[in-house]
Regions:
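Alpha-helical scaffold/interaction cores of sigma-54-like transcription cofactors
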Residues: 1-739
């Protein structure tokens, strides 16, 4: 039997078209002994980060073994580890390493792209509405970044019904990429089927000239075996396959086979069929609706060998592609945006002349009092983690400017000269910020907060969460709460023992939030600022309703089934299998004599949790040092406020920071808008200019309102439960409220 890997695979991130979860695909491939798979969703890279993360998790065991064996070999070679026969021991370690490496599963990052029939800037009617399919795989890190560019530009420049690229873009970003001719929607197969043989050959020559041995012709065989399926595709595939094999011989191009995977197992075909009904807005019994062949499951190596036993090289060539693909990481250390520091304060070039690498080594590896606290190995590891000496000059410049701003602000707040307590607190916090590599983050946050207050007239909240524990944040104007007065812990906010990016949630009045984001976009550049994508999944009740609708289950019965689903299940996650186990009526529905009810439950279980659509994170925004598409793929979404297109990362918020991008949270708070409006009303009707930040927080009349529970509209004190406790506890000081 020939070895084989799948190179044309759609996950659930091929929205309402793929029905396969990343984890199930990887698990099945590994169980079948495959050495890797590709993920090639339609026009996007939404699932790539989840894919690489899951594979890394699966590979953690063998990677740990390899790391330990390398360490042992180094120890033997240096003499730190003694053994009787060094050569034999090292040979044994290398053999074990080879065995561990053979267990590694390789993730291949890819995308099934749409190539415009003309050029991606043409957007005129039916000829430009779609495009030819093309499988594009990243061979290495360079290829990954080129794929990001292609996919991002397809959204931002080429979108017309679908995200489209074109030949010009492929020429520009072809390095490090492998391409395959795709399904019968691909340019070459489509032209063969349409008897445009000269045009098909022209396309083959063009791709061969550009990609050389990294261009492959792709064979597929989807012979439908059930009545309600697409029986027209297979004859077309066979027509295309015959000519593709002929062209492969003529132009010395290798062929591969694929199965255009859209679901995991054969028994998922009917669930996938219902998903396509949802996607196309058709009922299951509609005779005109779109049908798949129902052969598009992740077939095993044995099943693929049976399909292509007459073309064994099409199977083995998939391993050639796998071997071409390198292991690389798509994660990155934090990529801090560049804050423009006044030149009269200092420049990187000036700092390079002023400070030696030894100066930087001492400053970044000693404590805030100049004491040596790290051994040489740990110190060098820290320098490396911060990006090396080249990066340290920038960090030091930002840290020094941050210190200047912090101490200037401290003198205004605490008076001059500063007390020893304040100085010690600021020196300690600034040291942590500097040696963790984050001074630029605080410069940027204070910049847009001060711009909101002084330039844009936007109300800014006093601070929330752990950032309120930072005296530096207080002195910069990021927060309005004195952490020294209220004995708030800085270590809850930043802790060198827990390396993670700072997280400052900033509240703006909800009318002004958009203005602040526009200011940030203009300052840092439209290509460097993006919102963060979210994925909407089919929840339990939604899955039932969706399947019921396409199957024409009466609405009353659909509603009845949904009402049987509990809001929560004791000690268990709420999902349909757990709900069925918990609710006898749902068990009865699952075994119902009515096939419509029974099938609704059966396929709702399969579709539950499937990604249904995308959205935009309510407050998360990326500000990047570079064009964001240098690091992650972007798509577009409509700005609800302006109707304009805005950039959105294709990786969601829980993983985006792994790639090095810096997330800032811009929250819109209605409470701030209410306060702003109240101040304006006082000015209008009383002629008084109020500064909300200077109103005393010790006003007895205000505490009387709290004690009476009259706090509707007061942020975090307006719920019925809070009002009840306020009446019971009778707070009389600010410390009572924050206890």
């Amino acid at each position: 039997m020939q070895d084989f890997v799948h190179l044309h695979v759609h996950t659930q991130y091929s929205l309402l078209d793929g029905q396969a979860s990343v984890s199930r695909l990887v698990d099945k491939a590994m169980k079948d002994g495959m050495k890797g798979i590709a993920v090639t969703d339609h026009g996007n890279m939404f699932g790539i980060k989840e894919f690489t993360n899951y594979v890394n998790k699966k590979n953690s065991g063998p990677k740990g073994e390899i790391k330990d064996l390398k360490k042992r070999i180094a120890g033997i070679e240096s003499g730190e580890i003694e053994c009787e026969d060094k050569e034999a021991e090292i040979a044994d370690c290398r053999a074990k390493m080879a065995e561990a490496e053979s267990k590694l599963f390789k993730p291949i990052v890819g995308c099934e792209m749409y190539v415009a029939r003309r050029t991606m800037d043409k957007k005129e009617g039916k000829p430009d509405q779609s495009g030819y399919h093309l499988i594009v795989l990243a061979k290495n890190e360079k290829g990954y970044h080129n794929l990001i560019k292609l996919v991002s530009h397809a959204w931002t420049r080429g979108y017309y019904m679908r995200p489209r690229t074109d030949r010009s873009e492929l020429e520009k970003y072809h390095e490090g990429l492998i391409v395959c001719s795709a399904c019968i929607g691909g340019e070459v197969p489509k032209k063969i089927i349409n008897d445009q043989l000269e045009e098909a050959e022209e396309a083959v020559r063009w791709y061969k000239n550009l990609f050389g041995d990294d261009y492959y012709l792709e064979l597929q065989r989807h012979k439908a075996t059930v009545p309600r399926a697409n029986h027209e595709a297979y004859p077309l595939q066979q027509k295309a396959n015959a000519k593709l094999l002929e062209l492969a011989r003529k132009y010395d191009i290798k062929v591969i086979c694929s199965n255009d995977v859209h679901f995991v197992d054969e028994e998922n075909a009917e669930a996938h069929d219902r998903l396509i009904c949802l996607s196309t807005g058709k009922d299951l019994d509609d005779p005109t609706r779109m049908l798949y062949t129902k052969q598009e499951w992740m077939k095993t190596k044995a099943e693929m060998n049976a399909l292509f036993e007459d073309v064994p090289e099409a199977l083995s060539n998939t391993l050639e592609i796998l071997d071409k693909v390198e292991y690389y990481s798509i994660d990155h250390a934090p990529i801090m945006p560049t804050f423009a520091i006044p030149e009269d304060f200092g420049t990187e070039e000036g700092y390079r002349q002023k400070y030696t690498e030894k100066d930087l080594f001492d400053e970044f590896t000693q404590d805030e009092n100049g004491k040596v606290v790290l051994d040489e190995d740990a110190a060098n590891a820290k320098i490396k983690r911060l990006g090396g000496y080249d990066k340290l000059y920038r960090i030091k410049l930002e840290a020094d400017y941050l210190a200047k701003l912090a101490f200037d602000g401290a003198k205004k707040l605490y008076g001059d000269p500063l007390s020893d307590e304040v100085k010690e607190r600021l020196v300690f916090e600034l040291y942590i910020m500097k040696t963790m590599g984050f001074p630029g983050y605080f410069l940027i946050v204070q910049d847009f907060i001060n711009a909101a207050r002084t330039q844009l007239g936007v109300s800014v909240g006093p601070g929330r969460g752990s950032a309120a524990g930072s005296a530096v944040a207080y002195c910069l104007g990021i927060t309005k709460i004195d952490p020294i007065q209220y004995d708030l812990l800085f270590e809850r906010f930043l802790n060198p023992d827990r390396i993670s990016l700072p997280d400052i949630d900033v509240d703006f009045d909800d009318d002004g939030r958009g203005e602040v984001l526009r200011w940030v976009t203009e300052k840092y550049g439209q290509e460097k600022v993006a919102h963060i994508i979210t994925y909407g999944t089919m929840a339990t009740k939604m899955a039932i309703k969706d399947v019921a609708r396409v199957q024409k289950l009466p609405l009353s019965e659909s509603d009845r089934l949904c009402k049987l689903v509990p809001d929560k299940i004791p000690d268990k996650k709420l999902n349909l299998p757990n709900a069925i186990a918990y609710v006898p009526e749902l068990q009865a529905a699952e075994a119902s004599p009515d096939p419509l009810v029974r099938d609704t439950m059966k396929y709702a279980k399969m579709l539950e949790g499937n990604v249904r659509g995308t959205g935009v994170h309510a407050c998360g925004t990326i500000i990047c040092r570079d064009d964001i598409t240098d690091w992650v793929p972007v798509s577009t979404a409509d700005d609800k406020e302006t109707g304009e297109k805005m950039l959105v990362t294709q990786y969601e918020g829980s993983v985006i920071e792994d790639t090095g991008l810096i997330k800032m949270d811009f929250l819109g708070l209605k409470t701030l808008s209410i306060i702003k409006e109240a101040v304006a009303n006082v000015r209008l009707h009383r002629g008084l200019e109020l500064d909300i930040d200077k109103i005393s927080i010790s006003d007895p009349a205000t505490y009387k309102l709290y004690c009476d529970g009259r706090t509707i509209g007061t942020f975090q004190f307006e719920s019925a439960g809070m009002q009840k406790y306020l009446r019971e506890l009778q707070p009389s000081t600010f410390e009572d409220l924050i206890a």
